[in-house]
């Protein structure tokens, strides 16, 4: 074991100077540049042949999806606009039908009420004419009774006042003149 301690490894250059950092050694620059160029060409080929087409495919698929979604949105907007127009047209037609039904019903009810009113007016006119005839007949009968009663009363009054029974024709003429007068 003593032998392992006696040997030392030399890491430095001769004369106590250290060796330069290997990437900065000028005698290996050319081979490093060639290696770097080969690595960049290989990386470029890999990226351009493998990675970029995949990324481009993803971008194209995304753009196509966006365009398809936009086209679908436009189509659905058109359909919803058509559905809204159809709904508004149906609503307008329903309102017009309801208005027509209301007008027709109102006119029918007004016509029925007018016919009923005319029938009632005719019945009332007939009843009124009958009542007027009855009143006229009753008045005439009452007036004829009044004449008789007035004649009897006048005769009685004259007999009471004068003491003589008056002539019935004269009393009748006097009562008639008074009633007409």
Curated annotation (Swiss-Prot):
Segments of this protein annotated with the region Disordered: 1-20
Cell inner membrane found in the keyword field: yes
Protein localization: Cell inner membrane
TM regions (residue ranges): 33-53
Primary localization class, coarse: membrane
Compositional bias (Low complexity): 1-12
InterPro entries: ATP_synth_b/b'su_bac/chlpt (IPR002146), ATP_synthase_B_chain (IPR050059)
Membrane topology: Single-pass membrane protein
Keyword vocabulary terms for this entry: ATP synthesis, Cell inner membrane, Cell membrane, CF(0), Hydrogen ion transport, Ion transport, Membrane, Transmembrane, Transmembrane helix, Transport
Gene Ontology molecular functions: proton-transporting ATP synthase activity, rotational mechanism; proton-transporting ATPase activity, rotational mechanism
Gene Ontology cellular component annotations, sorted alphabetically: plasma membrane; proton-transporting ATP synthase complex
Subunit composition and interactions: F-type ATPases have 2 components, F(1) - the catalytic core - and F(0) - the membrane proton channel. F(1) has five subunits: alpha(3), beta(3), gamma(1), delta(1), epsilon(1). F(0) has three main subunits: a(1), b(2) and c(10-14). The alpha and beta chains form an alternating ring which encloses part of the gamma chain. F(1) is attached to F(0) by a central stalk formed by the gamma and epsilon chains, while a peripheral stalk is formed by the delta and b chains.
Function: F(1)F(0) ATP synthase produces ATP from ADP in the presence of a proton or sodium gradient. F-type ATPases consist of two structural domains, F(1) containing the extramembraneous catalytic core and F(0) containing the membrane proton channel, linked together by a central stalk and a peripheral stalk. During catalysis, ATP synthesis in the catalytic domain of F(1) is coupled via a rotary mechanism of the central stalk subunits to proton translocation. Component of the F(0) channel, it forms part of the peripheral stalk, linking F(1) to F(0). The b'-subunit is a diverged and duplicated form of b found in plants and photosynthetic bacteria.
Family in the record: Belongs to the ATPase B chain family.
Name under which the protein is recorded: ATP synthase subunit b 2
Natural source organism: Rhodopseudomonas palustris (strain BisA53)
């Amino acid at each position: 074991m003593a032998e392992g301690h006696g040997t030392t490894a030399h890491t430095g250059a001769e004369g106590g100077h250290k060796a330069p950092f290997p990437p900065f050694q000028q005698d290996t620059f050319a081979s490093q540049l060639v290696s770097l160029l080969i690595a960049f060409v290989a990386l470029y080929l890999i990226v351009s042949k493998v990675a970029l087409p995949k990324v481009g495919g993803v971008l194209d698929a995304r753009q196509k999806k966006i365009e398809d979604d936009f086209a679908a949105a436009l189509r659905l907007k058109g359909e919803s606009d058509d559905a809204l127009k159809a709904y508004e047209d149906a609503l307008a037609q329903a309102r017009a039908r309801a208005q027509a039904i209301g007008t027709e019903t109102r006119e029918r009810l007004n016509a029925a009420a007018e016919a009923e009113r005319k029938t009632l007016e005719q019945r009332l006119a007939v009843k009124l004419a009958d009542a007027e005839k009855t009143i006229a007949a009753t008045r005439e009968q009452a007036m004829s009774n009044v004449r008789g009663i007035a004649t009897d009363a006048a005769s009685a009054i004259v007999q009471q006042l004068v003491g003589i029974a008056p002539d019935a024709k004269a009393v009748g003429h006097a009562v008639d003149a008074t009633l007409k007068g």
